[in-house]
């Protein structure tokens, strides 16, 4: 009579068994062209994986370990231009994630266990910086800077994804055009707008996102004007600020 191994002994033997050799698999299109090439081991993806378009151009390259994406993933557009390059660890994004448009980098972000963390940079299609943020637990948290044509136009602060504290807007010459404070994403405190020479133009007090009382307005010589009605020069300056001039 044959002696059956104890179940625990069988489990140990199975665990000690060496993994099988990786098997190459290819998916082909109607004309026989390779559309996907990957490696499998013990029924799961293990090794390089590549995807191609019908002309043979590479669309995606990555790597798997025991069924989980691990390493660098690179994605290309149909014309061969880079779309995204990111790092994975155990199946989730972990490390640098760079995104491209027309071959130019438009965002750079660090990922930690699948969640955005650390510095986040955004660029326009000319490659000029448009935003510099900091992420914590997937939310904007900390100082934030925004740019237009490489010129700083706003400095703000965020807390857990909400604007918090002072926010300052700048003109192309670096002068302050507006300053205000936020509490939990709502205007809270004085909002001040300025003439191009830096003189105070308007001041409005906010509480929990709503104005309190009438605004105080001043002409370019610093003289108080009618609170109930903005003068034409004040209105024109407000229009400029709205347009971003």
Segments and roles (model prediction):
Residues 1-245:
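Glycine/tyrosine- and acidic-biased, solvent-exposed loop/turn segments at the edges of beta-strands
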